[in-house]
């Protein structure tokens, strides 16, 4: 699942992403951000790892990536205003798309998933 969003005035493709709310676990945040940006409820099933991403403005982000299964579309919700659309695309469709990626990490995460590098959610702890 990919979201189409506007970044610096350009429509780009990205995975649902966001931030942690106070007292929220990474897994809870991943499910919440997916719901807010796509209106899809999801079960987070595995962890793909962490990537350090430095944005063009110099800010450094730690990006945690997860595997999820979309379980239910919530048609009572309105997705975040920053999201143009939600797309279901294979890797090949993504590469053939004329829409740019928000960052190279988008394709890297897909490649990690295809390579089978996902690990148990037990690795992600919230104390």
Q: Where is each model-derived feature located?
A:
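Short, well-ordered strand-loop elements centered on a beta-strand within folded domains, enriched
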Residues: 1-4, 74-78, 121
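Short N-terminal signal/transit or membrane-insertion segments
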Residues: 1-5, 22, 115
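N-terminal strand-loop-strand
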Residues: 1-15, 42-46
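Unchanged
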Residues: 20-43, 52-104, 126-127
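A short glycine-rich, hydrophobically flanked beta-strand micro-motif that places a catalytic Asp/Glu
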Residues: 48-50
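Charged phosphate-binding loop/patch that engages nucleotide di/tri-phosphates or the phosphate backbone
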Residues: 107-127
């Amino acid at each position: 699942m990919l979201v189409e969003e506007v970044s610096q005035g350009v429509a780009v493709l990205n995975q649902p992403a966001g931030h942690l709310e106070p007292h929220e676990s990474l897994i809870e945040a991943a499910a919440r951000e997916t719901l807010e940006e796509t209106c899809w409820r999801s079960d987070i099933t595995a962890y793909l790892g962490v990537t350090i991403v430095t944005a063009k403005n110099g800010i450094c982000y730690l990006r945690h990536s997860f595997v999820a299964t979309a379980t239910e579309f919530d048609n009572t919700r309105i997705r975040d205003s920053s999201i143009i659309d939600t797309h279901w695309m294979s890797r090949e469709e993504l590469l053939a798309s004329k829409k740019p990626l928000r960052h190279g990490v988008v394709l890297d995460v897909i490649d990690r998933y295809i390579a089978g590098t996902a690990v148990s959610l037990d690795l992600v702890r919230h104390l």
